[in-house]
From Swiss-Prot:
Protein's organism: Bacillus subtilis (strain 168)
Pfam families recorded: Phage_XkdX (PF09693)
Gene: xkdX
Top-level taxon of origin: Bacteria
Protein name per Swiss-Prot or TrEMBL: Phage-like element PBSX protein XkdX
InterPro entries from the UniProt entry: XkdX
Family listed: To B.subtilis YqcE.
């Protein structure tokens, strides 16, 4: 599991921070989708970060 997905789950990071990580390619859309599937992040968080519905 990607650090940023876990950081969002444990509230160590905000969605804005994860957006930056995505821009720097520290996190991928696939990582975020996996987080939604494992119920670590919500579909709303996924949409806020990626701009796309799950």
């Amino acid at each position: 599991m990607n650090y940023w997905v876990l950081a969002l789950y444990y509230e160590w990071a905000t969605t804005d921070m994860v957006k930056q990580a995505l821009a720097y390619e520290d996190c991928s859309i696939q990582d975020l989708a996996e987080g939604v599937n494992k119920k670590l992040i919500t579909a709303d968080q996924y949409k806020e970060i990626t701009g796309k519905a799950m």
